[in-house]
Curated annotation (Swiss-Prot):
GO terms for cellular component: cytosol. GO terms for molecular function: methionyl-tRNA formyltransferase activity. The keyword Transferase applies. The keyword Protein biosynthesis applies. It catalyses: L-methionyl-tRNA(fMet) + (6R)-10-formyltetrahydrofolate = N-formyl-L-methionyl-tRNA(fMet) + (6S)-5,6,7,8-tetrahydrofolate + H(+). Keywords: Protein biosynthesis, Transferase. This is Methionyl-tRNA formyltransferase. NCBIfam families: fmt (TIGR00460). Its EC number is 2.1.2.9. Attaches a formyl group to the free amino group of methionyl-tRNA(fMet). The formyl group appears to play a dual role in the initiator identity of N-formylmethionyl-tRNA by promoting its recognition by IF2 and preventing the misappropriation of this tRNA by the elongation apparatus. The gene is fmt.
Length: 311
């Protein structure tokens, strides 16, 4: 039985962890995840999805703010694990930890060498990619630059967003890891080096990237909105107040970018630099998320053709 330490934090990671737990070939010695955080308006302390899974299965949990130089690091190294598996962990592993195990692999949510970094699924959608995927790779000191053990892809559909793609890729990554790890550990599956010249990067989304620019094409705005749903959520401004947009459609239409060019009882069409967008699910400042129909029947009843978003 291969003794493993698992490292990760979000739901994506938890799905991969469950796959390892359910496989009798592996013994989970410990889980390393981010500390519990205060979330939401009420600032309730919440544990990570990975911690929840670990506690359900009575697996010891370590939660260092930063693994390198921590007391937890020494405890983790003393466990005498065969290897480490990470998935969306978000920290570099110290060299001495990597040197202390026989193997260390990462489940990364992109088709490397494209989209190294912390937000690969967001960028795949924002950039209008037609497919996304996962790569099982060896861990090295450079971010997501290790040799590739296996890759798998899946189409990005028109109704996909970050949430749906996270779910799809978590399952894809889990299954690919379970399928290929035995052959990798036995030496039958040889890793392949990445072409570093083709590497692209996906740093964490900034607040400036969340802001919609209606001079862009309708298709680009559509991709930006779904590439930030359900987090961090794209936004614009209306009458000087922040206005979040969860869903919209790219359609035909002409007008000045940001201008309302059509309004009915259940639709609101806004012009872009090329084409137009039909708003579907929105969230005015300080209000809950709602359909555009509910918005127009209430808070947005006074919006008229000729008004502008983005101001």
């Amino acid at each position: 039985m291969t003794k493993i330490i698992f490292m990760g934090t979000p739901d994506f990671s938890a799905t991969v962890l469950k796959g390892l737990i359910e496989n009798p070939s592996y013994q989970l010695l410990a889980v390393v995840t981010q500390p519990d955080r205060a979330v939401g308006r009420k600032k309730e302390i919440k544990m990570s999805p990975v911690k929840e899974v670990a506690l359900e299965h009575h697996i010891p949990v370590y939660q260092p703010e930063k693994l390198s130089g921590s007391q937890e690091l020494e405890s983790i190294m003393s466990l005498d694990a065969d290897g480490i598996v990470t998935a969306a962990f978000g920290q570099f592993l110290p060299t001495k930890l990597l040197d202390s195990v026989t193997f260390a692999v990462n489940v990364h949510a992109s088709l490397l060498p494209k989209y190294r970094g912390g937000a690969p699924i967001h960028y795949a959608l924002i950039n209008g990619e037609e497919e996304a995927g996962v790569t099982i790779m060896e861990m090295v000191k450079e971010m997501d630059a290790g040799d590739m053990i296996a890759k798998a892809s899946t189409p990005i559909l028109e109704d996909d967003n970050v949430g749906t793609m996270f779910d799809k890729l978590a399952i894809l990554g889990r299954d690919l890891l379970i399928k290929t790890l035995p052959d990798y550990l036995s030496g039958q599956l040889k890793p392949v080096a990445q072409n570093h010249a083709e590497a692209t990067f996906s740093p964490n989304i900034t607040s400036e990237q969340e802001k919609l620019d209606f001079t862009k094409s309708a298709r680009a705005i559509f991709n930006q909105v779904r590439g930030m749903n359900p987090w961090p959520i794209a936004h614009t401004y209306f009458n000087g107040e922040r206005f979040k947009i969860y869903e919209l459609l790219a359609i035909e239409g002409q007008g000045a970018p940001g201008q309302v060019i059509e309004k009915t009882k259940d639709s609101l069409i806004v012009a872009t630099g090329s084409g137009a967008v039909s708003l579907r699910v929105v969230q005015p400042s300080g209000k809950p998320k709602m359909t555009i129909k509910d918005y127009l029947n209430g808070l947005g009843r006074d919006i008229k053709v000729g008004d502008y978003f983005g101001q």
